[in-house]
Swiss-Prot record:
A GO MF term: tRNA binding
A GO biological process held by the record: translation
Subunit structure as annotated in this protein's UniProt entry: Part of the 50S ribosomal subunit; part of the 5S rRNA/L5/L18/L25 subcomplex. Contacts the 5S rRNA and the P site tRNA. Forms a bridge to the 30S subunit in the 70S ribosome.
Protein name stated in the entry: Large ribosomal subunit protein uL5
Keywords: Ribonucleoprotein, Ribosomal protein, RNA-binding, rRNA-binding, tRNA-binding
GO cellular component: ribonucleoprotein complex; ribosome
Role this protein plays: This is one of the proteins that bind and probably mediate the attachment of the 5S RNA into the large ribosomal subunit, where it forms part of the central protuberance. In the 70S ribosome it contacts protein S13 of the 30S subunit (bridge B1b), connecting the 2 subunits; this bridge is implicated in subunit movement. Contacts the P site tRNA; the 5S rRNA and some of its associated proteins might help stabilize positioning of ribosome-bound tRNAs.
Family matches, as InterPro entries: Ribosomal_uL5 (IPR002132), Ribosomal_uL5_bac-type (IPR020930), Ribosomal_uL5_C (IPR031309), Ribosomal_uL5_CS (IPR020929), Ribosomal_uL5_dom_sf (IPR022803), Ribosomal_uL5_N (IPR031310)
Domain of life assignment: Bacteria
Alphabetized Gene3D superfamilies for the sequence: 3.30.1440.10
Top-level taxonomy: Bacteria, Pseudomonadati, Pseudomonadota, Betaproteobacteria, Burkholderiales
Alphabetical list of Pfam families matching this protein: Ribosomal_L5, Ribosomal_L5_C
Record family assignment: Belongs to the universal ribosomal protein uL5 family.
PROSITE patterns assigned: RIBOSOMAL_L5
């Protein structure tokens, strides 16, 4: 069974974007290729348990096990040696990606404190969108009592859109709450 947003994309988003931008082929219509969740954990150099807890949180949020990212080179000012674990990331594609996007837009974003919509300026010029989340407790899978610290994460949405205008129209069609 395909994810709800996957069906929604095929049945409603594609025709809407074809009409809006005048694409000649269905394959021209921009689509979301992947969503990457990244958690930078600079404070993990002192305590290895921080990485384990962050990996656990990301696993619950994404539904798949993240990869622990390691330092590419040593930085004496930050007391980091090469190969030290300094973060965790997970890449979602296909059905899991659509399920995450559905939960993110319909459940997690409305739970953000003082939420007035996401910025419409966080596109990179090539049709990809980045959003920072200040605390992981906005996701319903995370239980507030069981976390050791509030951690933020970066969510990158990679699309096949050629420019920011197409990408914004694509995410807008997925009911993304843009404020501007």
């Amino acid at each position: 069974m395909a994810a709800r947003l996957q069906e929604f994309y095929k049945e409603q988003v594609v025709p809407k974007l074809i009409e809006q931008f005048g694409y000649k082929s269905v394959m021209e219509v921009p689509r979301i290729t992947k969503i990457t969740l990244n958690m930078g954990l600079g404070e993990a150099i002192n305590d290895k348990k921080i990485i384990e807890n962050a990996v656990g949180d990301l696993t619950k949020i994404a539904g798949q096990k993240p990869v622990v990212t390691k330092a590419k080179k040593a930085i004496a000012g930050f007391k980091i040696r090469q190969g030290y674990p300094i973060g965790a990331m997970v890449t979602l594609r296909g059905e899991r990606m659509f399920e995450f996007l559905d939960r993110f837009v319909t459940v997690a974003l409305p739970r953000v404190r003082d939420f007035r919509g996401v910025s419409g300026r966080s596109f990179d010029g090539r049709g990809n969108y980045n959003i920072g989340v200040k605390e992981q407790i906005i996701f319903p899978e995370i239980e507030y009592d069981k976390i050791d610290a509030l951690r933020g994460l970066n969510i990158s949405i990679t699309t096949t859109a050629k420019n920011d205008e197409e990408a914004k129209a694509l995410l807008g069609a997925f009911k993304f709450p843009f404020r501007n």
